[in-house]
Amino acid sequence: MHFNEHTRFAMDIAQEAATELLRRFHDHHDVRSKSTPNDLVTEADEFSEKLLVARIRRRFPTHGILTEEGTSQSSLASEWLWLLDPLDGTVNYAHGLPSFSVSIALVHEGEVVCGVVCSPCQDLLFVAERGQGAWQDGKRLHVSAAPSLSEAMLSTGFPYRMVGNPENNLREFAAVALRAQAVRRLGVASLDLAWVAAGVLDGYWEANLQPWDWAAGALLVEEAGGKVTDYDGRRWTVETTRLVATNGLYHDELLAVLRGA
């Protein structure tokens, strides 16, 4: 597959950052809390973010950049905007659990045009370019054929602040778990979506999201033939905070369960 300049660049820098994260994985980490005690940041997050931002500013100096750790906070209205999660799965990483990723998306005039998710521990690179399909290491991806929620394995996530949060996902989790074949919690939103695109997971839902959490993965799912909306069934935008992604075959069924929870 021949990708355009932006996508090839995103692939290169994602792999560079992933290599550095993997090299530091078994080191002792300086772990700090951000908004809550379970909202963590490590020196690896910050190193990866600074590396990615520096590479983008050198190559595309006029582009905006929006990052999880705050190194760069451009407006969502920027004509060209890079959305970066330099270490998706920080809690996993800090505990030595080998499930984390680097997630990069490029937005042009409000539309995500390329997305890259790199899983260093599994040596996997997921890539999507709008109109060109979703790919994993040269293999074209397609969502699963699970026809109904009862035959689907899904993944979800939970917010950092659970107590007193009406969107803590506990009601929704219980409602879906009683109807689905299985529900998993991997702790890495970008990889959840990549696995939906690959047909390994059949669906994913989560609230309290930021655009860098899901933008690359959402494009992967769409380009793999799946469906991505908000909880109300509207097509996603970079301002969406509650996301549902499926193979498209039982999407309305899942939305109905979430609404009824």
Regions found by a protein language model. Name each.
Residues 46, 50, 69, 86-89, ...:
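Generic detector of well-ordered alpha-helical packing
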Residues 1-87, 249, 256:
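N-terminal subdomain of lithium-sensitive/metallo-dependent phosphomonoesterases centered on the IMPase/IPPase/PAP
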Residues 32, 57, 72-75, 117, ...:
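Short secondary-structure boundary/capping segments
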Residues 142-261:
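An extended, acidic
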Residues 21-24, 45, 56, 90, ...:
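Residue-level signal for inorganic ion chemistry
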Residues 27, 100, 128-132, 222, ...:
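A short, compositionally biased
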Residues 76-135:
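DPxDG-like acidic metal-binding loop motif
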